[in-house]
Amino acid sequence: MLEPRPRVFFLFVSCLDDLIGTDHEALLSALGARHPEIAFRMCHMNPISLGSRTPPPVSIQNNLYSLLAPSEKRDEGINAIGNLEPTAVTSELYHFLSAYGVSRLRHISQYETLNAYQEMAGSRANLVIGAPGRQAAGQMEERLGIPWIFMPVTYDMEEIEDNYRRLKAFLFPDREEACDWGPARERALQAIRRAVKKAGRFPIIIDASAASQPFGMAKALLTYGFSVVRVEAQDCMAFDKPHMEWLREHHPEVELHQPEHHRAVLFDRRMENSLAIGVEGAYLAGSRHVADLFNDSGMFGFDGVCRLMRLIEEAAEQETDLGQLINGYGLVV
């Protein structure tokens, strides 16, 4: 018997359980009846469901936020949903929220107990930064009455400004403008100029493990003066499709590949002199220079542009031990 007693118990099952028809609802019902003090949740680590409405990343988000109970209290806090890591404290997003009186941008990683976690149920709105959190946010709106807005990470300066206008209209429609984006925008422009000067000579490869909008990142970097030559993405999310179409129209020379295509194992697309953003594209190309970014970690707004530029500069300055990087991620290749 576990001591102290857990409040929540997540059961992870593989595709085998789904294929043999395991009755998970019956299992959850039996466990709940035997241990009513514990909330049981079933998570499916099933690659077969990747093309379904609830692939594993979405299912996990749904289960996590289903633990929040309706709250009688409502404060000015905002929840960040879907992003695996909290937005970096250097982001101007905090300055934006603070200018309108919001002192807390809550993220699930900030909580150590279930009781403390319930604080998120009292927030006034959900900012969905990671796409897998959209379904959970919709469920939270139905159960908890928390409205939400989807704003995936972008590295395009114009899109960033537009996102902040959308966010202001969503959160504070009746308030006067309280933020000056000039300084944050100028910092991003300076970071871009430095990075282009240092890394502009490298052919750049972008993959979907690094960013939720790899085609959008490619568009932004090409606009800034970088030499993007390849995008590796198994699928293109609907919100990233306009960027992919832009690439096809304006830069048809950029290669678009699927990393899980059966020909990928031939390794006939090696480009060792490239600078890869993301470990998947780096592995397939054998890149000697790698900007180690995973899932837009901590990125948002103009600060996200600055941080991406620093990663590119650092990658240009030194070669990467690709084997060590892959082992560090615990990837199976």
Predicted feature residues:
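An N-terminal assembly and electron-transfer interface module characteristic of large anaerobic redox
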Residues: 1-333
